[in-house]
Amino acid sequence: YGEARTAQDSVMLEKTFEEGMQVFPDSAFFLNNLINTYIYSNRNEKALEMLNVAIQKNPNDANLYNVMGRVYETGLKDYANAEKNFQIALEKDPNLTDALSNIGRIYYNQGVNKLSEANMINDSKKYQEELSMAKDLFKKALPYYKKAHEAEPEKMDNMIALRGIYYNLNMGPELEAIEAEMNK
């Protein structure tokens, strides 16, 4: 392992993790590192395959579902499956802050996209409909980001998202409060 790691030989490293899994099938070390190797090399289908193996071995590990959600979100751009896996992660651990902010980000980004679409519409009625859908998505993201922020009050990403949500939902006092927090 050390030799492969030092040489940064990803092929050898991957082979080492695969062999380690065969020799130590109950050890999460080799499986988790193999999953990370697949993720960082953008082999998302292989990462999902190994994540499913890991979940079979440890079905109550919320982090595995969270990682699976990230693979779906960032690697495959499959937001429905990303959301589903983030929800499962939160069912397993309602306080998993990464999953809270990840699912919040799914809704927030959808809201931003919907807002951009709305801004391209000239018809007032259609604009209002799209704007309403965008606001609903921001409202959906809000509780996840609030809970993540409560758990990790120093995390700037959560504060930036909350600022955007408060701004888009015309929540003046909350916007002022989060901006004051950000400027500490």
Positions of the model-derived regions?
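Canonical positions in the second alpha-helix
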Residues: 20, 53-54, 88-89, 148, ...
